[in-house]
């Protein structure tokens, strides 16, 4: 029988327990390896400060490495009665080591414990997302090398506007992603603070070496104020989701462009059939479903970002169970953004440009603004030149 970390000798109503646990025991499988690694470092700190003997620390570390191996092999699952990964880890240690296992929670709370595991995961995931962004930028460079010189009519208000080329078009996404990388690095730096040792938001009444654990865990610095450390849960998630939403926003806009430009009626771009799906009733349909999902997933991420910024609002300082609900939306959004980055790389690696249809789109009216500036170069005031050209095209349309 699993014991709760907060066990006090009474039994919680079964429905209440199911409600409060929710699917946290499932979600926590994503962070358990980080919690195990942080627990190993925590045990080393306890030994350094005299709260564990060298032999006790060695046994705990060996047991935690065994658990980590089981997790990585898919041979360990958190049970609903464990509630979360923190309880599952401690119960494993107690079952394995007895009294020694009960010492692992000395000088920490589940609050700083989960913050530590989450931030370690966030840092890893941000690195992966950065790599995927860079890979997409390389694909964009390849697209520009193949098709960048081809011109076509750019659009405003979903109407033909002025000439542009595919180097400028694809370069816009590459540059947008570069700004996203700067934002990502800023968010990474903010998250890169160790919360371990702050307890439930008011520190722990015993000596701890927070600088040691921060260094061992790979954090660049310690987040010293214990109240702000707890208050930053929700804030840091919002910042993370904000940068994810910026990436998904840029991909959303370009997915819309590709869908529009690959319309048979437009035809600038050609999507390979293997990147499309079909209709269950209309045999002729070849649909850009992956791009439509890329477009839609931006709204998925934004909705999670709104949840992250609104859920902690109006809470007094300190931990609240409300914050448990942020884990799953953040993890889901991380996975979504990684997936849409991969899909957009595949798209840009394999999409083709129809040179003839693209260049044929630059009809006479698309050059109207250029005609205005030809007159300006002859000394005619811009507004007069504008009206002269506008009148000409107005007559032609009539």
UniProtKB/Swiss-Prot annotation:
Keywords: Amino-acid biosynthesis, Arginine biosynthesis, Cytoplasm, Lyase. The keyword Cytoplasm applies. GO terms for biological process: arginine biosynthetic process via ornithine; L-arginine biosynthetic process. GO terms for molecular function: argininosuccinate lyase activity. SUPFAM superfamilies: L-aspartase-like. InterPro entries: Argininosuccinate_lyase (IPR009049), Fumarase/histidase_N (IPR024083), Fumarate_lyase_CS (IPR020557), Fumarate_lyase_fam (IPR000362), Fumarate_lyase_N (IPR022761), L-Aspartase-like (IPR008948). This is Argininosuccinate lyase. It comes from Thermotoga neapolitana (strain ATCC 49049 / DSM 4359 / NBRC 107923 / NS-E).
């Amino acid at each position: 029988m699993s014991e709760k970390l907060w066990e006090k000798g009474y039994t919680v109503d079964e429905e209440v327990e199911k409600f409060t646990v929710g699917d946290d025991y499932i979600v926590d499988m994503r962070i358990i390896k980080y919690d195990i690694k942080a627990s190993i470092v925590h045990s080393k700190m306890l030994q350094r400060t005299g709260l564990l003997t060298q032999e006790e620390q060695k046994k705990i570390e060996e047991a935690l490495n065994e658990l980590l191996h089981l997790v990585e092999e898919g041979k360990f699952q958190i049970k609903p009665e464990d509630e979360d990964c923190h309880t599952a880890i401690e119960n494993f240690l107690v079952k394995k080591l007895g009294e020694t296992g009960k010492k692992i929670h000395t000088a920490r709370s589940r609050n700083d414990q989960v913050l530590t595991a989450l931030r370690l995961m966030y840092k890893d995931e941000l690195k992966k997302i950065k790599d995927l962004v860079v890979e997409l930028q390389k694909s964009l460079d390849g697209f520009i090398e193949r098709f960048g010189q081809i011109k076509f009519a750019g659009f405003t208000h979903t109407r033909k506007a002025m000439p542009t080329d595919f180097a400028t078009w694809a370069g816009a996404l590459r540059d947008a992603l570069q700004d996203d990388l700067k934002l990502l690095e800023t968010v990474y730096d903010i998250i890169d603070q160790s919360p371990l040792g702050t307890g439930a938001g008011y520190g722990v009444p015993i000596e701890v070496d927070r600088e040691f654990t921060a260094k061992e865990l790979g954090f660049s610095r310690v987040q010293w104020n214990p109240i702000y450390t707890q208050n930053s849960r929700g804030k840091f998630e919002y910042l993370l989701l904000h940068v994810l939403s910026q990436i998904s926003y840029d991909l959303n806009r370009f997915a819309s462009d590709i869908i529009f430009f690959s319309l048979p009626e437009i035809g600038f771009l050609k999507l390979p059939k293997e990147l499309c799906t079909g209709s269950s009733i209309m045999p002729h349909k070849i649909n850009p479903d992956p791009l439509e999902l890329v477009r839609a997933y931006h709204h998925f991420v934004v909705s999670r970002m709104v949840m992250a910024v609104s859920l902690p609002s109006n809470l007094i300082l300190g931990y609240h169970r409300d914050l448990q609900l942020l884990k799953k939306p953040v993890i889901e959004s991380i996975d979504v953004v990684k997936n849409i980055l991969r899909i957009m790389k595949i798209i840009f690696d394999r999409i083709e440009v129809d040179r003839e249809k693209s260049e044929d789109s630059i009809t006479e009216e698309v050059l109207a603004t250029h005609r205005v500036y030809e007159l300006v170069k002859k000394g005619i005031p811009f507004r007069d030149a504008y009206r002269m050209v506008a009148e000409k095209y107005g007559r032609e349309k009539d």
